[in-house]
Amino acid sequence: MKSRLGVNVDHIATLRNARGEGHPDPISYARQVMNFGANSITIHLREDRRHIRDEDVAIFSKIKRVPINLEMAANNEMLKIALKYKPNFVCIVPEKRNEITTEGGLNITKNKKIIKKVISKLNSKKIRTSLFINPNIKDVFASKELNAKCVELHTGKFALKVKNNKNYLVEFKKIKKCALLAKKLGMEVHAGHGLDYKSVSYTHLRAHET
């Protein structure tokens, strides 16, 4: 399958909120990246609303041109919002209030009960669910057990090692191994966090060599 690009516009909203005005507008920027060929748009509604807000989710939910991927924590408040606006995808992510951005994958074992509940509710409304996980085999199997339709593999360590010209092959092999397993188990595979032109081009060049 051909690779697809999803673009996260959260930090356009961060700039807007810092200015205290209506611009820059994440909706306008989303339209621009769609014009340039993006295959989907990602927004993260955090519990503290530090960038994307509820009203943004309402507007993005009306976009039909490309799929909308809503990132959110696994809790009842966010579940209610997702069921109201029905995005194409929901990616369940961990959240810490003191983090600048999402720092790692879900602790599925610790949060299994609430994650299972959220996935079940979303699946019943035909909203495709994804779990944001670290690239390890255990979490791929756990995601399948919870009936997630997709996994998003955390690429942060890989991207950082590429940026610093360190030994990134080990991290790449972890991601590839998990991606192949998830696909074999019937799940769609997404990958994200910290990727840029250099790290993405590396994955393309090395995909058939390792």
Task: Kindly label every feature range from the protein language model.
Residues 1-68, 75, 83-86:
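Conserved N-terminal beta1-alpha1 strand-loop-helix module at the mouth
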Residues 203-210:
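Conserved small/polar residues in nucleotide/adenosyl-binding loops
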Residues 68-108:
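Glycine/small-residue-rich loop that forms an oxyanion/phosphate-binding "nest" at active or ligand-binding sites
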Residues 25-40, 83-95, 137-157:
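Alpha/beta enzyme core
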Residues 47-60, 76-78, 99-117, 138-139, ...:
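Active-site-adjacent beta->alpha loops and helix N-cap segments on the catalytic face
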Residues 5-9, 41-43, 68-70, 90-92, ...:
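Hydrophobic faces of well-ordered beta-strands that scaffold small-molecule active sites
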Residues 10-12, 46-48, 71-75, 95-97, ...:
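Active-site beta-loop-alpha junctions enriched in small/polar residues
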Residues 92-146:
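Hydrophobic, well-structured mid-protein blocks that either form specific transmembrane helices
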